[in-house]
């Protein structure tokens, strides 16, 4: 099987992780084939303008995956899971099914290395308590069973989500379902992309490896203090008790109870030996994350 200049297929290319990986690889001069369900979207057009080959496909459609992986040297694999209110509803097999289809297509195409993004907690004591982790574990097993050389990344909470989609900040306060003294590891999407690029650049050193990714490990109270220090204003911490969400979402309440009781530790010093530029939350907020932070507080001030 001949490969086109070590082209890497990036799934989820218009999303948080896939978009960061595509941008990082393009910046490194790596040919990128970006998979999207809609090549007319603004993000897809931006990828094309940045130099990516944009292809239309669906992770649940094996034929489209065969076309997308043809001639690719590598694949970045990221899959949306099923959760309450999510796009796949209660299709609990979606993640493992699409991972299996992608792995099979990659194997058939002769892909030489696959980097799969999962989540922290898989394979640990939390897995038996959390359905989401069990589904992530099933997806990992599908990738391992594909026979394609691979690296698995297990990122923690995205720093970007604090100021964006998860709306943890509400009216200038940090509103959290976790207790004030509960530790929560965080990672920047750009650092996930950096680890993916490192694995693709030296697959021999990273094949078969699993990396749990975080650049910072802080309590909710510390997080509020860091945000307040960076933006120069008081950011109160407001806790939402588990009992307040139990009626509407029992699964979320169960997950929060487990997270409040079990710390998810990450070996950040070991990660920095691989990627010395790993960012803390404060470094991210004052650096590449500053536009997102500024935009959030500008909206607060304008309200």
Residue ranges and their predicted role:
Residues 24, 206, 230-231, 242-303:
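A hydrophobic C-terminal alpha-helical subdomain
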Residues 79, 118, 239, 262-264:
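Short secondary-structure boundary segments
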């Amino acid at each position: 099987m001949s490969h086109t200049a070590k082209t890497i297929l990036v799934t989820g290319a218009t999303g948080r992780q896939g978009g960061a990986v595509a941008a990082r690889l393009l910046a490194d001069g790596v040919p990128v084939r970006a998979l999207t369900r809609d090549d007319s979207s603004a993000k897809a057009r931006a990828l094309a303008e940045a130099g990516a080959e944009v292809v239309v496909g669906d992770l649940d459609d094996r034929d489209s995956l065969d076309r997308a992986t043809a001639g690719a040297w590598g694949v970045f694999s990221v899959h949306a899971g099923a959760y309450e209110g999510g796009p796949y509803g209660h299709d609990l097999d979606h993640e493992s099914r699409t991972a299996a289809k992608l792995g099979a297509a990659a194997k058939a195409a002769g892909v030489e290395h696959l980097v799969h993004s999962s989540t922290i907690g898989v394979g640990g004591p939390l897995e038996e308590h959390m359905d989401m982790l069990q589904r992530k574990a099933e997806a990992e097993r599908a990738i391992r069973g594909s026979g394609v050389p691979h690296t698995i990344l297990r990122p923690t909470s995205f720093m970007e989500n604090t100021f964006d989609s998860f709306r943890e900040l509400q009216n200038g306060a940090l509103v959290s379902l976790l207790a004030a003294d509960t530790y929560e590891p965080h990672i920047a999407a750009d650092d996930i992309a950096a680890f993916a690029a490192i694995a693709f650049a030296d697959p021999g050193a990273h094949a078969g490896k699993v990396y749990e990714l975080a650049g910072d490990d802080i309590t909710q109270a510390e997080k509020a203090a860091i945000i307040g220090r960076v933006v120069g204003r008081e950011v109160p911490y407001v806790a939402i008790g588990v009992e307040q969400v139990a009626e509407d979402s029992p699964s979320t309440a169960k997950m929060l109870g487990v997270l409040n009781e079990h710390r998810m530790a990450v070996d950040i010093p070991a990660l920095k030996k691989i990627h010395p530029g790993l960012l803390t939350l404060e470094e991210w907020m004052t650096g590449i994350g500053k536009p997102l932070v500024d935009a959030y507080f500008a909206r607060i001030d304008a309200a």
